[in-house]
């Protein structure tokens, strides 16, 4: 879908740049090749993007203008509605907002970008430092020591999927397996207190009325993912 929006809006000046936060260059390669991506598709194995822009989960989107200025705070923006019945994040409003901004029909954000941009707390920064230590140790053959730091990072930032889930493939844990679904279940049961869309693109019942989506349970999603090559 990112490729589709790139093809649609590139003639009007938009450049889509995707960054996969993954354990290796090979992990996202099949998805990039399957999409026949012609937009810049990068891989961040050190979690630098998540650190720089305080991203706690994916997908998180930033809009940057021609001057290199961030014109919209971190936002939740799914390009596909395949999992919308599970996440309850519909993409109708985010896509409409993006098109309107590119076509200069509306501002990028109606509020104060600086005031509404989510910044890390001291504990968040400590968690990312712990993750960085764990990552370095893992790259130097010290898996047991790395495990302690990854666990510590998750304890400091239980809300941060890029830390907790992001460490899973490095530690030999399936990032779409039981550990991830347990973590996602905790988030849902807690009322989804973090990783939420911005107010102007938040999902409403109207979105599902205008653009209905197929229902999918977590069990069905797991089965679908297991069946994919």
List PLM regions with ranges.
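Short coil turns that delineate tetratricopeptide repeat
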Residues: 124, 157-158
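Alpha-solenoid helical repeat scaffolds
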Residues: 131, 164-167
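Alpha-helical linker/edge segments of TPR/alpha-solenoid repeat scaffolds
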Residues: 170-198, 210-211, 227
């Amino acid at each position: 879908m990112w490729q589709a929006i790139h093809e649609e809006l590139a003639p009007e000046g938009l450049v889509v740049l995707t960054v996969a936060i993954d354990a290796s260059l090979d992990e996202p390669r099949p998805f990039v090749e399957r999409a026949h991506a012609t937009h810049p598709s990068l891989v961040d194995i050190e979690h630098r993007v998540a650190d720089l822009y305080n991203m706690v989960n994916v997908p998180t989107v930033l809009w940057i203008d021609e001057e290199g200025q961030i014109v919209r705070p971190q936002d939740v923006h799914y390009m596909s509605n395949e999992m919308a019945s599970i996440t309850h994040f519909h993409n109708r409003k985010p896509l409409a907002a993006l098109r309107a901004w590119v076509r200069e029909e509306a501002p990028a954000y109606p509020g104060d970008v600086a005031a509404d941009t989510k910044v890390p707390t001291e504990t968040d920064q400590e968690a990312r430092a712990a993750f960085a230590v764990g990552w370095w140790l893992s790259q130097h053959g010290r898996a047991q020591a790395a495990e302690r730091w990854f666990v510590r990072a998750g304890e400091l930032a239980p809300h941060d999927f890029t830390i907790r889930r992001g460490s899973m493939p490095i530690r030999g844990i399936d990032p779409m397996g039981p550990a991830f679904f347990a973590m996602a279940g905790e988030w849902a049961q807690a009322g989804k207190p973090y990783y939420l869309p911005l107010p102007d693109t938040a999902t409403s019942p109207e979105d599902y009325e205008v653009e209905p989506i197929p229902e999918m349970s977590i069990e069905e999603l797991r089965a679908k993912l297991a069946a994919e090559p």
